[in-house]
Structure formats: structure tokens, C-alpha cells
Amino acid sequence: MFTSEFDVEALGSEIADALELIPSKRRIFSRSVDDKSWSSRIETAMQAYASAQVSALQPWLTANAEDTAVVLLVDLSGSMGTRIVPIASELRRICEAFSEAGISMAMLGFTTVGWRGGQSRQKWFSAGSPSRPGRLCDLLHVTFKQFDQQIRDDDWQSMLHPGLLCENVDGEALLWAAAMLEVRSEAKKVLVVLSDGAPVDDSTLIENGARFLERHIRSVIAELESNRALRLGAIGIGFAVDGYYANSSQLTEPDALSEKLATLLATLTD
């Protein structure tokens, strides 16, 4: 990477404050009461949440209630678009089911602070634009639910903010999530990625070649899949992820997320 100086890591509820000093993000992350788009997304997600069913997860939750830690890592790229609304409603139910079962679980998300490289690209340009700079954007890593805590409204609602979805650097996000799991004391450590496409950050790819992020994510996946202390799998959101992950499934309807997750978790912990 060229620099990590401008990367942001925050709880969902902290995003607005964390980005307040960044002029390009200040307006779209305003918690204004007249933000109709955000309010509409929350309302729609709550309606879907009211009817969401996670009964398919119950057998796995019951069988793995002890000595298991799970991380769900959600791709928050711009291509997720309006699909994030039904996905978020399902994820809230899933988080609650894990908490009720007493299973340690965290839900994380990854995107970028903005588009076109942000402050990292500006710094690179000021430094004379050296060739092959490595990752050239400002990462945004968000914790929506912490281990051993219930999901909170303000953390969850931030997932639905229209200004959140930007670009996706999957490899570094995987390493971040895996590092959280590695320090857990549970015997079974499971990382499940929800992804709707290949890693993309235009600023990075323009300066390093079209396959730069692709090579990195494949290297990271190979490293994690060879780690016997961690079980890794992925669910593709309208996207086939089997070309990346040894254990995976594909989701075409958001309301089937708990079923897909239950099947994948059973495979990973069998």
C-alpha cells in the first residue's frame, strides 16, 4: 500500500463522527432528520425484518452453542446498491439469533471512505506520483456488531446509509476480520464473507494493473484456507464466489440468507 494514514476503522454508530473532518464525506454522512433516502431505507428494512425467518439456523446454533466464534464480513461496495436493504434486515435477525443462542459473533463491513482514491491519492500525487504505489485509497472498516454484545439500532442503521457504499478492497478486509478471530479463545473460529463481486478500487487498479487486487485476495484466501485454526467460507450475493473460495454458496433471494448461511456453517464446522 502507498499509505494507511487515511484509513478509518469505526463502529457503525461512530461513522458520522469519524468522517466529520473529511469535507467530501461530511454532507452525505450528516444525520439530518430530513435525509429521506436513509429514513426510507431504514423503514423498508424494518418492514422486511419483521417478517424475516431464521429458523433454518436453529439446528446449527443449538449444536454449536459452546466454544464457537463467528465473524460475518459484509461487502459494502457500491454495486450492492439497494440490495443492502433486504440483506441488512436478514442480517439483523441473524445477529439476534446468535446472541440468543449465546454464540460469540461479530458482524463487520468493508468499503472505502470515498471514490477516486481520496486523500491517499492526493498524497501520492503530492509525492510525485511514484509508479506501482500499491493500494491507493482510503479504507473504511466498520464494526456493526461486536463479539458478546447484542446488535444496536444505531450501529445497524448505519449499514443502510446511502453514502456508505463505495469501493471494495477484499484482501485487506479479510486479514482484518481474521485477526479479530485469531485472538479469540474459542476452539472453533469461523469467518464467512458476504460478497457481491470481485475486489475493485479504480484508483489502485489504474496505477498497479487490472489484476492487482485480484492477485492479493487470492493470496489472502490461500493463506487463510491453509490456517487450520480458522474455517473460511463465502456467500455470493448474486455472484458466484466458488472461483475464489473452496467453501461457498450463492444467494439469489435475500430472504434465503439464513438457509444459505446454515448450510455453509454446517459444512465449515462438520
Model-identified regions with their sequence ranges:
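Acidic, glycine-rich A-domain
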Residues: M1-D270
